[in-house]
Amino acid sequence: MCALLSGGCATTRPTDASVDPIDPNEKTNRKFYDFTDMVDRNVLAPVADAYIKYIPNPMQRSIGNFYDNLAYPNVILNDFLQGKVRQGFEDSLRFVVNTTIGLGGLFDMAAPMGLLQHDEDFGQTLGVWGVNTGSYLFVPLIGPSTYRDAPGIGVSAVSNLLFYAGSFASAAVVGPVTVLGIIDKRARLSGPMRVRDQAALDPYLFVREGFLQQRKHLIYDGDPPPESFDDPMYEELEQSKPITKSSTGSAH
């Protein structure tokens, strides 16, 4: 998330009126962004604010842990697909520990054992496999993506244990649990969303450039080698850097 914020804060609108090579569908993407932002401001944000205000922090952490644990098979799957065999076994053990000792993931009992949380997904896997980024996309009601990352949305969904909850639980249970997961996710984004609103000259570009930089950061596990940036996305990000730093200091 720090990469998202630092990238977005440094973004200004390009003065060149030509089509952006990383975002050739910008006109359509902006419409999707505006629609999603409207829904967020009028529906999700007020609910998330109430959640943050009235739900105690320890309970929020446990709820977040629970949903992270439900989604963790996706991390394990992509560990192995990327050839990170040791990390895959460590994450498998983390999942087992938190599911059992951690009471279904409500408590992160694995971290004190040295089994730290990782962030892997199918979009990163495709990047590791050498698939080009492709054009930027903004998926309505979901958020920023790229042609390469888009298939990962489906993989993340079907590898989430909540996807299969309907097989052994009624809709009266699955529905509220799903809604709570959406609220939890939005609540975790409240801080970055406020920074976006306060610091970004163009919120759309803030989200886009921050997302692209964050994805590059994740694919290279936080250490991207400059000589490896032959992806058009890197050229675009380089062109998007501001000419000077803000005189008031860096915004984070």
PLM regions: where:
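Short, solvent-exposed loop/turn elements at domain surfaces
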Residues: 13-15, 40-41
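N-terminal Sec signal peptide cleavage junction
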Residues: 8-9
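Beta-rich strand-turn-strand
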Residues: 64-66
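A small/polar active-site loop signature that marks catalytic segments
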Residues: 61
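Sec-dependent N-terminal signal peptides
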Residues: 1-2
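Post-signal-peptide N-terminal segment of Sec-exported extracytoplasmic proteins
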Residues: 24-54
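A structured, mid-to-C-terminal "fold-capping" secondary-structure block
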Residues: 16-19, 129-252
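Mid-length scaffold segments of soluble, non-membrane domains
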Residues: 69-147
